[in-house]
Amino acid sequence: MSNISTTALGWAAFGAVPGADEEYRAVVTRAEEWLAARIGFTPHARRAAHDAPRVTPDALVSAIIARYGKDRTFSIPILTTCALAGRLGSGKQSWRWVLPLPFELAACPHQWFAALHLPVVSYALPALIAIGQARHFHLPSRNPAARLARKLTRRRTLKILAQIQPSSGGFLEATPLTSFVVMSLAGSGQANHPVTNQGVEFLSKSQRADGSWAIDTNLATWVTTQTVDALANLQVPMANFSSQRVEQLAGGNWQSAIQGWLLRQQYRAEHPYTHAAPGGWAWTDLPGGVPDADDTAGAVLALAQMRKADSQASCESGCGAPGAEILAAARAGIEWLLDLQNRDGGIPTFCRGWGALPFDRSSADLSAHAIRAWLAWADEPPADLQKRIEGAISAALRFLAKVQRNDGAWIPLWFGNQFSAGEENPTYGTARVVSALCQARRRFPLADNLLVKGGNSLLASRNADGGWGGSAAAPSSIEETALALEALAALLALQDLPAGIPRAELKSTVLLGTHWLLDRVESGAWTRPTPIGFYFAKLWYYEKLYPQIFTLAALGRVAQVARELAPAGPNADEPIAGA
């Protein structure tokens, strides 16, 4: 679906290229009409009676800021792009529409950042520096103290920007953030700066054959750990998932290859960018990654699952990475997550204590993932670590109780749905939390209260066709149906289903969802991705492997309860053939 962020950026791109407005007049006009229809315009803003409405800077700025609220991480880069492209007027006065970013604060010790309540999120330091400098270059602050501070820290913050730029040149290995930095530097007299040159090189190398760029270039760590998690649901030896092709690609035993690869991705030193402590994992194996909660939890879980598979298969040496090495890596990851936990009991993405802005706050899906990771290693010594894990899970459950909606749902942070109210995705969030609660309830009684409301929320949000969308009545998708189905099948597998969840309805819903998903598998539609990924600045992405991974996880979980789903009677047909 079209949205104001991408349309404004696309419209600005045509303005930035000399002659593009005239050469592609029809495209530019349609974009202006779309924007004007959604943000409003004044009658005198028409060029002539027969022309399309003109997008006025005040209306555009108001709409962009309203979309993102007080978080300047997203609104200011978009408006800076518009200013650099001449879409907010001409001359330095066009920059009055771009709120200044206090880039001078980047010169402070990094330990101060959380307390300073920066107007951008923890991972946006490059944007704070580069975009802040662009605004200062074109329209310095009227405040003499701020103007002097920015003048004095300009070189120092540029040096910091160079220090935190990864060797690939791409900040977070992401096109949008890197582009915002490059264009801001180039537009403020720094076109030949080393950061600019390395950023341009990254963008040149990452352009696709059709001339476009992907939002993210590499999610290798994330999709690998998600795949291992999905395979674990099948409850058969992982060694069975092999072939000559797989062994050839892995250079031998594929489990050993993945274990070794994951161990090499763990950060062994403080991260130069966010100053995260050692022990975490990023979403990618490329140098621009930053350790985060979701990927660290995913890696810790994957190591536990493969270690369990090795043990069950009674492998000799060479079947996997040494047990001691895996245990040490897992403990480091567990402690990294424990140290990341906020005072509210929830888990944020990158940094502890940066709770002023939404993308730095604790979130339900990240907290649920951390709970699963902690539970996977909760019985490992030493005793003091076990005690910390128990306390952390209890705190995380209290956080989940606090943020659960009245309808029983939870909202995730990094996933959304364009067809749902507020572009949220309660299906993703609720499914992830319900799956974690099914595992936590054996030790933590509080989980059952949350589980009843969460499970019933998933039951109530199923569509009439048997599938799920991002929320009730949103179009059903492979990803969301698989996520909901996996969670409900895990619920159905419980020997003592919590009172308040109707078993008959649960069984029928799982059966309907299974049929919906199997129909898509058999037709080949199960490989078609949906843009449920939520990137910074409310930009959307899809991942080709999501529907396949989530479907595998869901059907593996359903297979565990297949006997319960089978109809009564010796002559009954098998209802979920193929699952």
Give the label of every model feature segment:
Residues 243-244:
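Generic detector of N-terminal low-structure segments
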